[in-house]
Amino acid sequence: MATPLQIMPLPVWPITFLEDAVVYLSALFTPWFTAFCVLWLHRYVRLIVHCYSHWTYKSKPIPSKPSYTSDDVTVVIPTIHDNFDELRPSLESILATKPHELIMVTTADKFEDLQRVAKTLSSPNIRIFCTQYANKRIQVCEALPKITTRITIMADDDVTWPSTMMPWILAPFEDPKIGGVGTCQRVKRVREGGLGLRIWNWLGAAYIERRNFEISATHNMDGGTSCMSGRTGAYRSEILRDYEFLEGFMKEEWWGKILKADDDNFVSRWLVSHKWKTWIQYEQECELETTLEDNIKFLYQCSRWARSNWRSNWTSLVKERHVWKQQWWCTYALHIATFTSLAFVFDFLILAALWWGTEGWEPVNRNRAIYAQLAFLAFSKVVKLVGLFRRHPADIMFLPVSIIFGYFHGLIKIYAGLTLNMTSWGSRTDGDTDDAHRLAPGPVRCSSLNTPRSEHKLPHYMQERDEIVNEKQQMREEEWEHL
């Protein structure tokens, strides 16, 4: 007789372990501790990823047989400087890289003065043009039709280039899918003068250093960035001379008005929308030097940049929406973060949620958790500035100022978000002379058109208008008959 099949009972310990784990996790993840975890992950996942991405970032190497040389480059500089003689060092550094041509565009009232300075530079490859209004988009559009080279570099009038700039900024264009290339940046440091002057100078240097960190990290993740800097950026001329680009560049809308600020943001979004890739050359040989305001006017610059970020990131996320598919990491780490990364709010909430979320813990463990969070918070305030401290160790004295300003900058972002209709510079002489043209109502189509007497048929749009009028008249007559 066959032995009946016996079913062995399952051991009790796995079930007991799971039950204990559920009980433990339920006790651990109180509402406040859950809130802490969510806030912490939202704020710091991108920082941890960016640290790894930045530290492993590699620039495109210079090819042994480059397809592009300096003779393929035209440099365009819009300028409204009040003293063109001060631009001489910057212009000489750019001309030292031997571009095919340097085109400068100023306003009509400053045209002769700029020509005078250009003649003293002893270079036959400089052309000067002028526009009626002091506006970068208008000035750039004045220069673009004159360009005959394959690459166009748009630069600010206060940047100083290293002599090694050109081969490095051209190297990424070996990839035919690359449409734009940016550079590493540094602020010209002030080592003499009062403490206030050096503090403002440090804040500007720290601002640019953080930007270097972010754009290299995001490019290493998905090739994206919120903005290719207008201080110096190289682009394929075929992109900038395209009729659709020029029309969009001059007719971008914001709140029903024509926006002629945020030019570099528009170019960056255009590259994304037309599936061109971008790259950043994070090398000392491709590192330009620039100047920022070293007084309270720096706050005006910060508010202007913050407004540009609000407007451009909102356009990217809501209106154009290309980044959702093409740059998934930048969508989270840059675009969405614009609306959620207020340090003075999130740092406080994370600490408060951790304190209340560990209320039932042993005092020793609770203190360890708080100290660990404070240590990580300090790390987050320092890690993006490591390059700055490495070059100038004495700058560590300014770290408390940087942390305090980081919290204050949250207020600047809120103010900028509430004043998005403002486009003024506020920090540059003559910079706001034509501010009314930066955000102005667009042209309105005339409601009636006068057509000369002719035996020819009316234009198509006139026919459509008459058909609509007749249709509305017929509807009114039918309504009256019904009544």
UniProtKB/Swiss-Prot annotation:
Keywords from the UniProt entry: Cell membrane, Glycoprotein, Glycosyltransferase, Membrane, Transferase, Transmembrane, Transmembrane helix, Virulence
Motif Dxd motif, residue range(s) on this chain: 156-158
Primary localization class, coarse: membrane
UniProt entry tagged with the keyword Secreted: no
Membrane-crossing residue ranges in chain numbering: 21-41, 336-356, 369-389, 396-416
Effect ascribed to mutating residue 156 to R: Leads to defective colony growth and loss of conidiation and pathogenicity
CDD domains hit by this protein: GT2_HAS
Membrane topology label: Multi-pass membrane protein
InterPro entries: Glycosyltrans_GT2/GT47, Nucleotide-diphossugar_trans
Compartmental location: Cell membrane
Pfam family, one: Glyco_tranf_2_3
Enzyme class: transferase
Family affiliation: Belongs to the GT2 glycosyltransferase family.
Its job: Glycosyltransferase that plays an important role in infection-related morphogenesis and pathogenesis. Involved in stress tolerance and hyphal hydrophobicity via its regulation of the expression of nydrophobin MPG1. May regulate growth, pathogenicity, and cell wall integrity (CWI) through glycosylation of heat shock protein SSB1, and other (unidentified) substrates may contribute to conidiation.
Name of the protein in question: Type 2 glycosyltransferase
